[in-house]
């Protein structure tokens, strides 16, 4: 396993304090292939990103530094927290999901 730096242009440019981070939001990509998922997360026009992407081989791509908000949680809430991008680290695992037949992970 290795960590690869490949930064996405999609994040909130305002820095946040580590104390603001309260959650980890774990998703699967839901894309047909790993390449398509990576391309989308790096595409400025997609307006989506994550802090970390776990590839099929176990390598990790760091896409957004933790002190910035990635755009992964959309309209979201948990208890008193709203817009979870503000308070979370987003981790994606490459998996086609229910739209393209789940793969074991």
Where are these predicted regions, by residue range?
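Active-site-adjacent loop/helix surface patches within enzyme catalytic domains
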Residues: 2-105
